Amino acid sequence: MRCPSLARLPHRALSGLTKSPVRLQSQNFLYQRCASTAALRSPIAGPAYQSVFNRHNLQRRNASAATAAAVLEAAASNPDGLSQEAIIDNLDPAEAIRLSRLRNIGIAAHIDSGKTTCTERVLFYTGRIKAIHEVRGRDNVGAKMDSMDLEREKGITIQSAATFCDWVKKGDDGKEEKYHINLIDTPGHIDFTIEVERALRVLDGAVMILCAVSGVQSQTITVDRQMRRYNVPRISFVNKMDRMGANPFKAVEQINTKLKIPAAAVQVPIGAEDEFEGVVDLIRMKSLYNEGPSGENIVIKDEIPEKVKSVVEERRRMLIETLADVDDEIAELFLEETEPTEQQLKAAIRRATIGLKFTPVFMGSALANKSVQPMLDGVIDYLPNPSEVENLALDRKRDEASVKLVPYNSQPFVGLAFKLEESNFGQLTYIRVYQGTLRKGANVFNARNNKKVKVPRIVRMHSNEMEEVSEIGAGEICAVFGVDCASGDTFTDGQLGYTMTSMFVPEPVISLSIKPKNNKDSANFSKAMARFQREDPTFRVSYNAESEETLISGMGELHLDIYIERMRREYRVDCVTGPPQVAYRETIGNRVEFDHLLKKQSGGPGEYARVVGWMEPTGKLEDNKFEEQIVGGSISEKFLFACEKGFNLACEKGPLIGHKVLGTRMVINDGATHMTDSSEMSFKNATQQAFRKAFMESNPSVLEPMMKIVVTAPGEFQGDVISLLNKRNATINDTETGVDEFTVYADCSLNGMFGFSTHLRAATQGKGEFTMEFSHYEKAQPQLQKELIQKYLKAQADRHKK
């Protein structure tokens, strides 16, 4: 769980917390120097100084250990009182340097905005790869981060891929500093949104990429929502500046208006489209150009081209004004009409970005190898290191009280498994280490089941390649083999009873019946299903006893198609699938009172349970609610627990069409028991029967999932696209017309969208694209409801005939 605000908490004096051991460290160097030269001055001086050095070194280690222990105690007992400043101040100096040079970032955006292309340049410029390969490139190699054959064939990212690299940042004084970056490239398609979700859950910052032509798109809004959910600071990069119709300032404006986050350009492009040459840095007021066969050399010039001078002055003024709205120091300078220095601007942008108040906007073209390196400098300058981000856990030993995680290597280990993958060597588990050190061969405990497991191997991942390491420190991301767990599990070294909140997992909206073509493939079919469920929390497998079918459920048609194709390729299992099935829901119509008696007394143990109360809508189509308002103890506590269980079971399969129930409240306020014949089973069954009867009397409704649809296509096809949507009874909410394309925003039932992609391709000569995301549930049309009920009743009747 990440703290809602990354702004520093007020620093309070904490008992037992010593000052930073930085001074001890500097004295340590002095003692070491004296010890090394003492033998030149006196035969006995060397051993004497060495003795002092050893004693002082022990004091330093003891001081660091005492400080770490005090910080750990403060993190548990008074997390609000322990500021990030105090945590950083009391870091071991070597650890402070390591963490300050570390960034954990993700790259996220709408589909086809250039995420993977941009990541490929980052890896090349940092020296991680020796050559650039394009997504769907002609060399049949493909981008490094698209390691699956399916990804390279389709030209889309399906799974998030992790890598690491080192970036050497050059200062204005020519001094070079090396930074370590853990980077995760995420998919852009909405069907694979869980990959973005779990990446952002463990990252400290992100680069949000936008298309210079399209600006903020539908999946950009989804990614923004996910970043806000986990309080992830971001910088923005307007890509594809070399494309026809590129308008980066439209993208900046849309970040402000559509995403509702203050944003300002920190660069101005020199030219655009096929005349895009480079950028002007608005903070340093210098021009930046890329040279070399792959743009690997950055050339900095003091001269700003005449053609962009007026735009540069205007955009710098807008940058300062926007910062003045979100940062007190710049606001003071602005009111005093004092021009801020480069250092003041950088510090303000960093504070505002980490505080989730602002996003700086960079510009470039990854495909044209232009202005990617300045964006990397922005990652270092403006995104937080692990010690600057507040992460919270829950202490199960203290009624799940919040505790702060401290990124010290000397603390007890706490880590989160955020992604599972099957490899040739077994299950690969990705872990973010929040506190302590994870060592090869160490025993760790799964907080979910208290199971102890040994860590046989630790690796750093570079897409589908790996590099073995012996240990990983706080703030790092790694992968381990041989650890059986589920996505979202917390691991500790056994000293602490901490658990971390898992990521948000959306409910599936579409299902298919599936079975292997040949019965001999059943074993591999079952293996594949088990593996895919472990890896992807949004992929669900269930068995329908009535139809005797296996059902797979997911986020969309593409999502399920990918898994069916993976089963064929990776497990050599060809499958037969049924038509798509919509995840309908049922809900109560109006308030209904009930007084139900279950009585079976025919010799021997009988059944007796009476439940009295009412059922009504909750007001919102959300979770169901059960309440008891018993006065006088007419139903005992254990029987009321059985009533609640019966209610929950009844909600799993509604009486109308056999789908889950939403937005229904059940209240039991009276009842009766029998001395010998009442049991928990009796009250569970009585509640289910009362539920079914009252539900059917309430004028219930079938609910169908409504989807947010965004269609983008060339302008000449606008009429055809609108016609396609109208045929599906879609509600068109808005349209946007660009230079050569248009975008339609609409709501439509999922049932009406089956086969839409095929019809869209035909209507737009293959040039149209669309995204679809679950929005809400809505009452189905009366005719559809009637058809669904008849179909369900027929299936029930056919089943009883068997």
From Swiss-Prot:
Annotated GTP binding sites: 109-116, 185-189, 239-242
Residue stretch of the organelle transit peptide: 1-24
Record domain tr-type G: where: 100-387
Pathway: Protein biosynthesis; polypeptide chain elongation
Record SMART domains: EFG_C, EFG_IV
InterPro entries (alphabetical): EFG_II, EFG_III, EFG_III/V, EFG_IV, EFG_V-like, EFTu-like_2, G_TR_CS, P-loop_NTPase
Keywords: Elongation factor, GTP-binding, Mitochondrion, Nucleotide-binding, Protein biosynthesis, Transit peptide
Example of a GO biological process term: mitochondrial translational elongation
Main location: mitochondrion
Residue spans crossing the bilayer: none
PROSITE patterns: G_TR_1 (PS00301), G_TR_2 (PS51722)
Alphabetized Pfam families for the sequence: EFG_C, EFG_III, EFG_IV, GTP_EFTU, GTP_EFTU_D2
Location in the cell: Mitochondrion
Gene Ontology CC annotations of this record: mitochondrion
Record flagged with keyword Mitochondrion: yes
Coiled coil residues, start to end: none
Gene Ontology molecular function, alphabetical: GTP binding; GTPase activity; translation elongation factor activity
Top-level division of the source organism's lineage: Eukaryota
Family: Belongs to the TRAFAC class translation factor GTPase superfamily. Classic translation factor GTPase family. EF-G/EF-2 subfamily.
Cited function: Mitochondrial GTPase that catalyzes the GTP-dependent ribosomal translocation step during translation elongation. During this step, the ribosome changes from the pre-translocational (PRE) to the post-translocational (POST) state as the newly formed A-site-bound peptidyl-tRNA and P-site-bound deacylated tRNA move to the P and E sites, respectively. Catalyzes the coordinated movement of the two tRNA molecules, the mRNA and conformational changes in the ribosome.
Protein name: Elongation factor G, mitochondrial
Species lineage: Eukaryota, Fungi, Dikarya, Ascomycota, Pezizomycotina
Originating gene: mef1
